[in-house]
Amino acid sequence: MGSNGLNGVKDTNGANGAHANGASLSRSLKPGIYAPIPSFFVPQTEDLDLESFASHVVRLAKANIHPLISGSMGEAIHLTHAERKTLIQTARRALDEAGFTDVPIIAGTGTGSTRETIELCHEAAEAGADYTIVIASGYFAGALNPKALKTFFTEVAEKSPIPVIIYNFPAASGGIDLDSDLITGLAEQCPNLCGVKLTCGNVGKLTRICATVSESSFATQHPRKNPNAPFLVLGGFADFILPSTYVNAHGAIIGLGNVAPHATARLFELSQATLQDPSLLPEAQRLQGIVARGDFTIAKTSIAGTKFLLEKLYGYGGVPRTPLPPIEAEAAAALWAHPHVQELVRVERELSGKLTA
């Protein structure tokens, strides 16, 4: 996932040293595709299924997809502090043992209060995370005006021992939808912020933020605290990876990366390549269409649908932790049979070299 200067982001992977918490400075945050990893559970007991989790993290790394642990897809709201730390430690160990020592880990640290969010940031760093991603709590959404939200993200960024990504996801935060002025203002004022994930799906907002952070003056006037953590603008859905490339976005953090890692990684690579070779645009457009249709269809079934597809494709996945229900049998059958899903599966198998059903 090396950036090679993509969209104005310098690749600083050659840096040496480590944070006091053990997070290596050489694990740069680079443009590309990241996947929010599901948390897998043992049937009946609902204990963490660490074996499946570790295997999945490595499977994605082999496809050049990097992990986000304990995010929305990872059912972070259902996890204890200790479980969050265990997942980070398990992922780091699995990646290192598989030879992916340079793959960074992003950890979700969103929760209720500012105090606990900061506490989770410290725990994530201690467990081996390189970066955190933070969502505003939606419990008191009606009372959190722009000033309160700015104060929240500023304080978390200042007190987190590792760089922080802003997570804008209105559906998971009581309708809180950060606008581009607030996000760019935070980016300018908080050197420990290293990006934003826009699961609002607002391409206009993404374009405006990219216009600010891609200016050459931004990096010089607002340098990051960690030189390996430039401010990345990342989409939250797979259906606008190609269009976002043309406004200087840096990739995406997408649930579809779990189901179709090769297809989504290839789409990002192709999208970047079209900037230098426009003859590749028709191929990129074709793949973007397949990915967009598949993403839209699968997203309707949420976490349970993604876990069902993982079970169907790879033999692990299971069901969500209660009270989140599993996908109904009829809905699961319809999802698997859907032509958009079957088309995506076919492309994924072709790109991964697995041609058998």
Task: Name these PLM-found stretches.
Residues 2-7, 13, 242-357:
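Structured C-terminal cap/extension of enzyme domains
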Residues 49-52, 56, 83, 87, ...:
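General structural feature for long, well-ordered alpha-helical segments within catalytic domains
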Residues 95, 160, 190, 310-314:
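A broad structural signal for alpha-helix termini and local helix breaks/kinks
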Residues 135-152, 197-212, 332-342:
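Repeat-unit-sized solenoid/scaffold elements
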Residues 155-159, 163, 170-300:
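Catalytic alpha/beta core domains of metabolic enzymes, predominantly
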Residues 2-7, 16-175, 352:
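Active-site beta->alpha loop and helix N-cap motifs at the rims of alpha/beta catalytic domains
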